[in-house]
Structures are given as structure tokens and as C-alpha cells.
Amino acid sequence: MPQSYDIFFASSNVHKYEEAEKILSEFGIKLGFFKTGLTEIQEDSLSKIAEQKVMDAFNRCKNAVIVEDDGLFIDSLSGFPGPFSSYVFKTIGNNGILKLVGDDRDAQFRAVIAYCDSNKKPILFESNVFGKISKNLQGNGWGYDPIFVPENQTKTYAELAEKNKLSHRYKSLKKFANWFNNKQE
């Protein structure tokens, strides 16, 4: 018998899905994985990118779906890499970011969860986490986790066992889950 899901998570990034699935399961939401590459517009707004991606995802999936877009915004680099974080990570990686950051290491991670169903009206859930860029790679996480130290912490995301409770993604997914569960009542 096929598994039934409440909603799908559309992405080509299995790490994002696994993190989202674990978080949403705490709220009783069954999340399926719709593995797909989505059209991503070149835009400096995470919200606009997420909104476009979730419409693309719904048109492909034909089921209630969420997408996530996030970015690392570094103060001393005027918010760079921001919405271009994925591309920048693929090209220069964490070591490249560490070389670019000066004395001001303040940064924030922002996340947007976008939901769309048959109404075709995207609903967005946004959050951010302030912190600093570490001086070197710490831990074995994926993406920028080994260089981002959340505010009031001494370890990077990659080193924190409780990362899922502190992350920008967790905060956005929690907002979504509360809305989704109330919508179902």
C-alpha cells in the first residue's frame, strides 16, 4: 500500500528534505519528497524566489507542496551571498567565504517556506537567525553549517546536536506547521 502524505517537499536537495521531514514529524505532519529541479529566478528577494518556486513545484507535483529557499547574509559583505548562497557555495565554498569576511563577522541566515495547494495562492512563512561567521571550519555539517555560529551559542550549526531547534529552517517550518495544523481543524 502506498504511503500517504499530508504535503510534499519539492527540492533537488535531499538534505533539506530530511531536515524538514524530521521537524514536521514533530508536529504530526507527514512529508513526502518530490525530488525535482525547480526553476529559480535571479532575484534579490528570497520571498519572490520561493513564491515562484512553489508555483513551479505545484504545477509539477499537482499536490499540496512546500518549498524552502534560504540564504546566508553577511553584514560586512552587504548581505552577500544572500539569495545566491547555493551558487556561491558551489563555486567558492566555505573556505572562500572565510577568505572574504573581514573583522565584522555578523551574519544572519534567512529562510522562507512557501506553501501552495489547488488554490494556487502561495503562502509564505519567513524567519531569520542572527549570528556570526566562525574564523575556521568547525564540525561536519552540510552547506554553511560549519561556519555559522548562531547568536548566544559558541558552536557552529554543524557542531550543535540541537541545530534543528535553533535553525532558521526550523523557525519557518514551525510557523508553517502551526498554520497548517490549524487550517486542517
Where in this protein do the model-derived segments appear?
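Anionic-ligand binding patches
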Residues: 2-8, 15-185
